[in-house]
């Protein structure tokens, strides 16, 4: 029956395909959670039961320093290499999040995690001792939202009672991976951002949570031809615009229906580009807008130029600042939109452009 209906037209609209799918599956199926062109509204409640943030000394000295769970004055975290230090942060964050959720890691069915390093080195070694099934993810600095999205889908779909999302970044390991060795002393342009040394972990479940994930809008890859790896904000802003506008259209909301629309690490340069791009699409989000990369450092005293970046930037800010405000009811609904620049050493050295991606998670006060 489904195959017959699908053959009727190769150019059917999204609404037509959605109707066919619902007829085939039944109105009580997971298909009925599809919203608009690329969003999902969870009918079965998904809650954040626990979260944790682990940061290095520079982040601890910033404006959000007092709110982080674990602050280490040693950027090596007692290890021998930067990569090992990043793995240690993930291990600590995941264990701390489970403790705050009053769970053993053995009760977490699936882990969704990733980082910025080749072959997800920090994640592979960081959570090996957890001994839980892992889905390794690479979404660059959007990985926090990507992991939350997939973890929420697994919980809402009944595939796991509890799932965890974890990600990290480290200034030194990222510089080593994508730019120049620290000893080289390369000068940074003002459009550059500072990779956050930090890890955030989140435990999702069907009950006993304090913030609800009510929906998600997975993002598309958007490439506007930018090639400057020292201006990540310009690379990622078009993708952020695309996802934010699609979320508003899919859920039929106005920007003011969110207390905050928060991107991950566009920084001061990307912020201005995003606000103009969104305005060109017919929305004004300036009143609600916030960026984790702008919040996490003081550029005047910490010499971070355009702001913070990295997978850890959005993750630790979500855990330390955004979730507590939602929990207290200071904010009722937040659109959380981490952004990622999808480059590698190979693609950049071959002269390729730097595409961007952004995933959106709708967070609500319980």
Where are these regions (language model features)?
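Short Gly/Pro-enriched turn/cap motifs at secondary-structure boundaries
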Residues: 191-195, 352
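A generic, well-ordered mixed alpha/beta core segment in the N-terminal half of proteins
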Residues: 124-176, 180-192
